[in-house]
Amino acid sequence: MATPREIKKRINSVKNTRKITRTMEMVSTAKSKKISDRVNASHPFSNKIKELVSSLASLGGVVHSPYLRRPEKIKTVALLIITANRGLCGGYNSNVNRMAKAKIQEWKKSGVNVRLFIVGKKGISFFKFAGEKAEKTYTHLDDKSGYREAEEFANLFLELFAKEEVDVVEIASTVYYSSASQKPEVTRVLPLEPAGEGSVSDMMVYEPSPEKVLESLLPLVVKTAFLKAILEANCSEQIARRIAMKSATDAASEMIKLLTRGYNRVRQAKITQEISEIVAGADSLN
């Protein structure tokens, strides 16, 4: 049985750990709130741009753009996987990695070549262990990442798609729906999905021509898609870390309660034993 001193030492150790997890929980809460505000602020603009570009794309034969190319057979896919550089965020990284791995296997079974681009140390190490070679890796993204990084990715994949080096561009990341709901999903970025029938009004007139309007807007809608993915992945990471740290803090508090009870029992037993020894000693003198 552990001595009171040993139990007390363990209680202090758990208390120190609880301080760390509680601090991390508070930091993640503040970061997730800040990033979620950025996500919500970007939605109206990105939705409007996507709506306008989809309407232009639905004009079909009127508009010609390399970014609207739809190959008869998909030969090569570019897949960008967004994970975190750090752990301590529950199943955030493992969920994205498993989903992306399943998607890669699905493409390969169909005879499609997959070009991997991985963001985050956790994704890089996972796919290195799985034997999947990444064409490019990135570890510079953090909770402050935004439009500059989105533009970097967009320019790369727009160029690959325009040169017909890839037929499809997809992003595997965690999509943010609300503070209570985030899901790992694969989102297709290119080619652009045109709007449905009747989405363009006959009364709509574009100045300058639809081709020039689309040419200027299409790179922008792709950049907003990457921006959305980056922001939502970062926000989801912070929410997952907040939940994980809260669970750790609660578990530490429960452990402290149990250890304190054990400490009191051992201490009480020791005191009782000492009293018994004193009484026994007194009796022997009599």
From Swiss-Prot:
Annotated keywords: ATP synthesis, Cell inner membrane, Cell membrane, CF(1), Hydrogen ion transport, Ion transport, Membrane, Transport
A GO term, aspect molecular function: proton-transporting ATP synthase activity, rotational mechanism
Subunit structure: F-type ATPases have 2 components, CF(1) - the catalytic core - and CF(0) - the membrane proton channel. CF(1) has five subunits: alpha(3), beta(3), gamma(1), delta(1), epsilon(1). CF(0) has three main subunits: a, b and c.
A family per Pfam: ATP-synt
Keyword Transcription set for record: no
Protein's cellular compartments: Cell inner membrane
HAMAP family cross-referenced by the UniProt entry: ATP_synth_gamma_bact
Predominant cellular place of this UniProt entry's protein: membrane
Membrane topology note: Peripheral membrane protein
Descriptive protein name: ATP synthase gamma chain
NCBIfam families: ATPsyn_F1gamma, PRK13427.1
The family this protein is said to belong to: Belongs to the ATPase gamma chain family.
GO CC terms of this entry: plasma membrane; proton-transporting ATP synthase complex
UniProt organism field: Leptospira interrogans serogroup Icterohaemorrhagiae serovar copenhageni (strain Fiocruz L1-130)
Primary role: Produces ATP from ADP in the presence of a proton gradient across the membrane. The gamma chain is believed to be important in regulating ATPase activity and the flow of protons through the CF(0) complex.
Gene name of the record: atpG
Gene Ontology annotations of biological process type: proton motive force-driven plasma membrane ATP synthesis
